[in-house]
Amino acid sequence: MSLSVEAKAKIVSEFGRGENDSGSTEVQVALLTAQINHLQGHFAEHKKDHHSRRGLLRMVSQRRKLLDYLKRKDVARYSALIERLGLRR
């Protein structure tokens, strides 16, 4: 199950540079993080759902690529985003 429209709008307004900024790297990473966190709860209950696990791994990979891009382009924004999202790096 994906995020609700309200949850996505909240993330966009919180991490975006404007109200309708859904394309910035920070917003994309925040949306992927929310979806990943939601799926982790799903896998606690459905351990053998390998089809969805592949989608989860794809999301994690996409988030990693976006974070690497942001780190190359602007280290300050990268560090701030990692801190706000509570990611390990």
From Swiss-Prot:
Molecular function (Gene Ontology), one example: structural constituent of ribosome
Family annotation (InterPro entries): Ribosomal_uS15, Ribosomal_uS15_bac-type, uS15_NS1_RNA-bd_sf
SMART domains linked to this entry: Ribosomal_S15
GO annotations of cellular component type: cytosolic small ribosomal subunit
Pfam families in UniProt: Ribosomal_S15
Superkingdom classification of source: Bacteria
Keyword Ribonucleoprotein: yes
Keywords: Ribonucleoprotein, Ribosomal protein, RNA-binding, rRNA-binding
Any one of the GO BP annotations: translation
PROSITE patterns: RIBOSOMAL_S15 (PS00362)
PANTHER family on file: RIBOSOMAL PROTEIN S15, BACTERIAL AND ORGANELLAR (PTHR23321), SMALL RIBOSOMAL SUBUNIT PROTEIN US15M (PTHR23321:SF26)
Family: Belongs to the universal ribosomal protein uS15 family.
Subunit architecture: Part of the 30S ribosomal subunit. Forms a bridge to the 50S subunit in the 70S ribosome, contacting the 23S rRNA.
Function of the molecule: One of the primary rRNA binding proteins, it binds directly to 16S rRNA where it helps nucleate assembly of the platform of the 30S subunit by binding and bridging several RNA helices of the 16S rRNA.
Alphabetized HAMAP family for the sequence: Ribosomal_uS15_B
Record-given protein name: Small ribosomal subunit protein uS15
